[in-house]
Protein backbone atom coordinates (compact mmCIF):
# COMPACT_ATOMS: atom_id res chain seq x y z
CA UNK A 1 0.00 0.00 0.00
CA UNK A 2 0.99 3.60 -0.58
CA UNK A 3 2.18 5.47 2.49
CA UNK A 4 2.29 9.21 1.77
CA UNK A 5 2.58 12.16 4.11
CA UNK A 6 -0.62 13.81 2.83
CA UNK A 7 -4.11 12.78 1.74
CA UNK A 8 -4.05 11.37 -1.77
CA UNK A 9 -6.64 9.80 -4.05
CA UNK A 10 -5.38 6.27 -4.56
CA UNK A 11 -7.60 5.02 -7.38
CA UNK A 12 -8.77 7.26 -10.19
CA UNK A 13 -12.12 6.62 -11.84
CA UNK A 14 -13.93 7.76 -14.98
CA UNK A 15 -12.20 10.24 -17.27
CA UNK A 16 -9.24 10.62 -14.90
CA UNK A 17 -8.58 6.88 -14.95
CA UNK A 18 -8.92 6.86 -18.73
CA UNK A 19 -6.28 9.60 -19.05
CA UNK A 20 -3.98 7.54 -16.84
CA UNK A 21 -4.54 4.45 -19.02
CA UNK A 22 -4.07 6.39 -22.26
CA UNK A 23 -0.72 7.75 -21.08
CA UNK A 24 0.42 4.28 -20.00
CA UNK A 25 -0.51 2.91 -23.44
CA UNK A 26 1.48 5.70 -25.15
CA UNK A 27 4.46 5.10 -22.92
CA UNK A 28 4.53 1.32 -23.21
CA UNK A 29 4.00 1.45 -27.00
CA UNK A 30 6.91 3.88 -27.37
CA UNK A 31 9.11 1.58 -25.31
CA UNK A 32 7.95 -1.61 -27.03
CA UNK A 33 6.49 -3.07 -23.83
CA UNK A 34 3.61 -5.44 -24.54
CA UNK A 35 0.58 -5.47 -22.25
CA UNK A 36 1.24 -9.04 -21.15
CA UNK A 37 4.97 -8.48 -20.50
CA UNK A 38 4.75 -8.30 -16.72
CA UNK A 39 8.51 -8.34 -16.25
CA UNK A 40 9.14 -5.22 -18.36
CA UNK A 41 6.13 -3.46 -16.88
CA UNK A 42 7.45 -4.20 -13.38
CA UNK A 43 10.92 -2.96 -14.41
CA UNK A 44 9.33 0.32 -15.49
CA UNK A 45 7.43 0.66 -12.24
CA UNK A 46 10.57 -0.01 -10.19
CA UNK A 47 12.44 2.57 -12.25
CA UNK A 48 9.91 5.16 -11.05
CA UNK A 49 10.68 4.25 -7.46
CA UNK A 50 14.36 4.78 -8.30
CA UNK A 51 13.60 8.29 -9.62
CA UNK A 52 13.99 6.99 -13.20
CA UNK A 53 17.70 6.42 -12.45
CA UNK A 54 18.28 10.18 -12.56
CA UNK A 55 21.49 11.45 -10.94
CA UNK A 56 19.56 14.02 -8.88
CA UNK A 57 16.26 13.88 -7.04
CA UNK A 58 14.81 16.92 -5.34
CA UNK A 59 12.37 16.19 -2.53
CA UNK A 60 10.00 19.11 -1.90
CA UNK A 61 8.69 19.33 1.65
CA UNK A 62 6.73 21.70 3.84
CA UNK A 63 6.44 22.25 7.58
CA UNK A 64 3.70 20.02 9.05
CA UNK A 65 2.68 22.98 11.20
CA UNK A 66 1.07 24.46 8.06
CA UNK A 67 -1.45 21.60 7.65
CA UNK A 68 -4.07 21.60 6.32
CA UNK A 69 -1.73 22.86 3.65
CA UNK A 70 -3.85 23.80 0.61
CA UNK A 71 -2.08 27.09 -0.11
CA UNK A 72 1.26 25.50 0.77
CA UNK A 73 0.66 22.80 -1.86
CA UNK A 74 -0.04 25.57 -4.37
CA UNK A 75 3.19 27.32 -3.39
CA UNK A 76 5.23 24.15 -3.75
CA UNK A 77 3.67 23.60 -7.16
CA UNK A 78 4.78 27.08 -8.20
CA UNK A 79 8.27 26.37 -6.84
CA UNK A 80 8.43 23.07 -8.73
CA UNK A 81 7.31 24.81 -11.93
CA UNK A 82 10.02 27.47 -11.55
CA UNK A 83 12.72 24.88 -10.86
CA UNK A 84 11.67 22.79 -13.84
CA UNK A 85 11.49 25.70 -16.29
CA UNK A 86 14.88 26.95 -15.15
CA UNK A 87 16.44 23.49 -15.41
CA UNK A 88 15.06 22.80 -18.90
CA UNK A 89 16.32 26.22 -20.03
CA UNK A 90 19.80 25.01 -19.04
CA UNK A 91 19.42 21.64 -20.76
CA UNK A 92 18.66 19.65 -17.61
CA UNK A 93 15.63 17.39 -17.92
CA UNK A 94 13.07 17.00 -15.15
CA UNK A 95 10.28 14.60 -14.28
CA UNK A 96 7.79 15.35 -11.52
CA UNK A 97 7.56 12.01 -9.80
CA UNK A 98 4.65 11.28 -7.51
CA UNK A 99 5.52 7.59 -7.54
CA UNK A 100 8.82 8.39 -5.85
CA UNK A 101 7.04 9.38 -2.65
CA UNK A 102 4.55 6.53 -2.41
CA UNK A 103 6.65 5.26 0.50
CA UNK A 104 7.42 8.54 2.24
CA UNK A 105 8.98 6.84 5.26
CA UNK A 106 11.68 5.32 3.03
CA UNK A 107 12.37 8.65 1.31
CA UNK A 108 12.47 10.37 4.71
CA UNK A 109 15.03 7.87 6.01
CA UNK A 110 17.37 7.97 3.00
CA UNK A 111 17.16 11.74 2.46
CA UNK A 112 17.42 12.48 6.20
CA UNK A 113 14.21 14.54 6.22
CA UNK A 114 13.06 15.52 9.73
CA UNK A 115 9.70 14.33 11.05
CA UNK A 116 8.32 17.88 11.23
CA UNK A 117 8.37 18.08 7.40
CA UNK A 118 5.71 16.64 5.07
CA UNK A 119 7.07 15.20 1.84
CA UNK A 120 5.05 16.59 -1.07
CA UNK A 121 6.72 15.56 -4.34
CA UNK A 122 10.00 14.55 -5.96
CA UNK A 123 11.60 15.98 -9.08
CA UNK A 124 14.01 13.65 -10.89
CA UNK A 125 16.69 15.65 -12.73
CA UNK A 126 19.42 14.85 -15.22
CA UNK A 127 20.57 15.33 -18.78
CA UNK A 128 17.97 13.76 -21.07
CA UNK A 129 18.87 10.70 -23.12
CA UNK A 130 17.59 11.58 -26.58
CA UNK A 131 17.69 7.89 -27.54
CA UNK A 132 15.41 6.77 -24.70
CA UNK A 133 11.92 6.32 -26.20
CA UNK A 134 10.04 7.32 -23.03
CA UNK A 135 11.51 10.82 -23.31
CA UNK A 136 9.52 11.41 -26.52
CA UNK A 137 6.13 10.64 -24.95
CA UNK A 138 3.88 13.67 -24.45
CA UNK A 139 0.58 13.38 -22.66
CA UNK A 140 -2.54 14.67 -24.38
CA UNK A 141 -3.54 18.05 -22.96
CA UNK A 142 -6.99 19.59 -22.83
CA UNK A 143 -7.63 22.77 -24.78
CA UNK A 144 -7.80 25.98 -22.77
CA UNK A 145 -11.52 26.26 -23.60
CA UNK A 146 -12.09 23.06 -21.60
CA UNK A 147 -10.28 24.42 -18.56
CA UNK A 148 -10.90 28.16 -18.46
CA UNK A 149 -13.92 30.41 -18.25
CA UNK A 150 -13.36 33.99 -19.34
CA UNK A 151 -15.60 36.59 -17.70
CA UNK A 152 -15.59 40.23 -18.76
CA UNK A 153 -13.19 39.91 -21.69
Predicted segments, located by residue:
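Acidic, surface-exposed loops and disordered segments
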Residues: 1-153
